[in-house]
């Protein structure tokens, strides 16, 4: 089949083409089906984020070519159904009961048709019931989403992806999963996320435009617009915000939040830590309760910790600050100045012990 052009007709359903289902707009779902069927998708107006093109320009572009005019926001239309329609040699309509979902044929013939009064000369092609639901309200959006979820999940399982509970797994049509990865119950794989072979994601995990490397474990966590290297473990309850790059064999533990930071190979941030606007090298140990103090109320500053350093529990790193290679920061310190390589820093008050203080207070009736 020769390449064809597709167009959506704006009008009463414009806002429904914009509705998001499984992390994509209705239009984007339809455009993916058109692309898989061998067509090119364009827009008459700003129905969604796609390329804008006027009807006149589209007529010129499609001169002599076949045109698919999508009339209803039926996000569950499949490439197979569109191919079945486009295989017709004559002007045809894809219908579901009295509703016309799409028109097919030469540009002049298609644009001249009134969908509400199709002549008998236009061939009718019946759409599958599960594909013909137009998205017009939350209830229909849910029904369509369920169809898309089943279709997408089944497709990935047939390619060798393990979905422990397909009923609670939602995968964007833009996501890429390698055979041999595993998604546990409650996974939301949104946007252009990728999951490599051997990775185990979930349960109850959100990936949005995230890249998860081979043999990673991401447990009950959220990762957005970030990359996780091979063999790294994340979670439970980690929050990786946009702009993070995590190396291989690293550990991002429970209640750790990362933002706009790089973490080197083999570095361990095991629990209860905030790392923001920072560059951490390789083989660093970050203790419990460490905080990068990166915001002064007006601007944000970066923190650098070089390879093989040790950051003790409850250390505050006041940015901008640089910790040299192989340094040791004792627990409880607030670091405000750069630390040279292989230095030991203790930045806390010396403890004062007052013997028998409690006993004396009790004898005096003050406790």
List each model region and its residues.
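Structural signal for interior beta-strand "rungs" in well-ordered beta-sheet cores
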Residues: 162-347, 351-352
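Terminal amphipathic alpha-helical/low-complexity segments used for targeting or macromolecular assembly
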Residues: 1-167, 173, 180, 341-343, ...
């Amino acid at each position: 089949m020769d390449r064809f052009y597709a167009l959506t007709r704006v009008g009463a359903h414009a806002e429904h083409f914009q509705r998001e289902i499984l992390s994509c707009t209705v239009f984007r779902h339809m455009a993916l089906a058109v692309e898989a069927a061998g067509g090119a998708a364009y827009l008459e107006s700003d129905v969604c984020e796609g390329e804008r093109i006027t009807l006149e320009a589209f007529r010129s572009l499609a001169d002599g070519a076949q045109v698919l005019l999508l009339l209803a926001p039926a996000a569950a239309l499949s490439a197979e159904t569109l191919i079945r329609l486009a295989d017709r040699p004559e002007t045809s309509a894809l219908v579901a009961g009295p509703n016309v979902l799409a028109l097919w044929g030469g540009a002049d013939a298609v644009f001249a048709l009134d969908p509400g009064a199709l002549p008998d000369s236009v061939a009718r092609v019946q759409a599958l019931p599960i594909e013909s639901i137009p998205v017009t309200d939350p209830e229909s959006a849910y029904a369509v989403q369920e169809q898309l979820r089943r279709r997408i999940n089944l497709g990935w399982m047939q390619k060798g992806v393990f979905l422990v509970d397909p009923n609670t797994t939602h995968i964007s049509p833009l996501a890429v999963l390698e055979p041999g990865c595993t998604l546990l119950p409650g996974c939301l794989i949104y946007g252009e996320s990728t999951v490599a072979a051997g990775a185990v994601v979930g349960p109850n995990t959100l990936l949005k435009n995230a890249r998860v490397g081979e043999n990673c474990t991401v447990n009950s966590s959220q990762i957005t617009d970030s990359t996780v290297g091979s063999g790294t473990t994340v979670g439970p309850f980690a929050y990786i915000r946009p702009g993070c790059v995590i190396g291989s064999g690293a550990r991002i533990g429970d209640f750790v939040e990362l933002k706009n930071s790089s973490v080197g190979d083999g570095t361990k941030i095991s629990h209860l830590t905030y790392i923001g606007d920072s560059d951490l090298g390789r083989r660093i140990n970050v203790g419990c309760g460490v905080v990068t103090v990166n915001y002064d109320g007006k601007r944000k500053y970066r923190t650098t910790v070089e390879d093989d350093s040790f950051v003790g529990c409850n250390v505050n790193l006041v940015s901008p600050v640089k910790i040299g290679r192989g340094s040791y920061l004792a627990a409880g310190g607030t670091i405000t100045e750069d630390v040279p390589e292989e230095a030991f820093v203790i930045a806390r008050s010396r403890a004062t012990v007052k013997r028998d203080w409690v006993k004396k207070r009790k004898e005096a009736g003050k406790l």
